[in-house]
Amino acid sequence: MSQITLEELPGVGPATAEKLKEAGFNTIEAVAVASPSELATTAEIGESTAAKIINAARQAADIGGFETGDIVLERRKMVGKLTTGCMEFDEMMGGGIETQAITELYGEFGSGKTQLAHQFAVNVQMDREHGGLNGSVIIIDTENTFRPERIAQMVKGLSEKYGMELDPEEFLQNIHVARAYNSNHQILLVDSATDLANELREMGKPVRLLIVDSLMAHFRAEYVGRGTLADRQQKLNKHMHGLLRFGDLFNASVVVTNQVMAKPDAFFGDPTRPVGGHVVGHTATFRLYLRKSKGDKRIIRLVDSPNLPEGEAVIAVTTAGLTDQ
C-alpha cells in the first residue's frame, strides 16, 4: 500500500482532495485505477489534469506498466480462494472462488443462486484453515432475497460440520446489506461499498466478498425494447468494471447472480442463456450455470474460465447449507 496522501499528488490541492474523497476516491490506489473522464467529472478539473494525477498515482502506488510473466505469477500468489463447502465444487474451481475476480452464477428460478450467495457470505468469515478468508461481506440486494434466518441455519450447519461453537449473531454483524431500488442506486452502492470497505479495513475487518443479487433485475425492468439496449449495455459495462475494480482494490471475491432467458431459435441443446449479453460475458471471470436436479441436488457447470477446463459438479442444498451430494 502507498504511504503518501492524496494531497501530496501533483495537481491535487486540499479542495480537489476533498472532492475526490467525497466521491469515494479515498486512497492513492482508488485514484490510480480511475479513468481520466471519471476523475475530471468528480473533481471538476480538466481531463489532461486528471490524466496527470492518475499517472502520478499509478507511479506512487506501483500500479500499471509492463511486468514479466514471473512477476505476475508471484503476484497471483496473493489471490485468495474461498471454499464453496463442497469438495467436488472446489476441485472444479481450482480450490474455490477466487479473489480479484468476478464469478457469475446464472440459472432459472429455484436453481440455488441465492443459496450459494448466502453460503459464500458465511464461508468467507471462517479462518483459512477452514477454507475462509477471515473477511467481512457486503451484499447489494436488488430483489429483497437476503434472509438472516438462512445465514443462522448455515452457521449452525458449519458448527456441526467442524465441531465448533459458532455464533450466528457474530456472522450477521460482519454482513453489510444494502437494498438497491433501481439501476442508478445499484451502481451508486458500489461506490458506497468502497467507502465502507476502506473503513472496515482500518478496523481490521477487511471485506473479502462483495455479492450482487441479482445483477440484471433492475436493468431488465428499466430498459425495455431494442431502442434502449445500447444505453443499457453502456451503463451495465460501467457497473461491471466498477465491480472488477472493487475486487482488485480490496483483494475481494465478487459474486454476481444473474437471470436467464430462453433462446427461441435454439433447436438443439439447452436454449437457456444468461441475460446481459456480451458485456457480462466478457467481464465475468468465471461463469457458472446452475441447474435443478432431483430433490435437493443441483448441477453446477463451469462454462467459462481463463485458466480452468469446463466441468460439472453436483451439490446438495440442505437446511444446513451446501454439501456434497
UniProtKB/Swiss-Prot annotation:
Top-level taxon in the UniProt lineage: Archaea
Binding site residues for ATP: G107, E108, F109, G110, S111, G112, K113, T114
Pfam family, any one: Rad51
Keywords assigned: ATP-binding, DNA damage, DNA recombination, DNA-binding, Nucleotide-binding
GO BP of this protein: DNA recombination; DNA repair
Entry-linked CDD domains: archRadA (cd19515)
Keyword DNA damage: yes
Key word Nucleotide-binding present: yes
Record-stated family: Belongs to the eukaryotic RecA-like protein family.
Protein name as annotated: DNA repair and recombination protein RadA
Organism, scientific name: Methanosarcina barkeri (strain Fusaro / DSM 804)
